[in-house]
């Protein structure tokens, strides 16, 4: 799983980074700013994605002078699915925490490191986890 861009699991196109960018902000943004926040594609490509998402109702657009401002439509029936995909990394760590909490002998510490901790890995990245057992604890 790509923990840096979790939406790519189901949305491998430019739509994924655009939806993720809008999910991570609650304020209206211009097409140019959406492109910057998405960090992918071209500005014109992002504008095409935004227009299509507006057409489907996932994004709301309003005019502000000559600019068009875009904001996620969090009331859309599909928006919780977008949020779920955007938050996959958080869900991964929450599940890891639950599993570790269920161990009969709790660890002294558990640390995620590397690209998974930074949130910048890709499909080729591993999930670096350091588990330190308490002194005299049982072996795993």
Predicted regions and their residues:
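Catalytic metal-binding acidic patch
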Residues: 114-139
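Helical scaffold of the NTase/Pol beta-like nucleotidyltransferase catalytic core
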Residues: 1-110
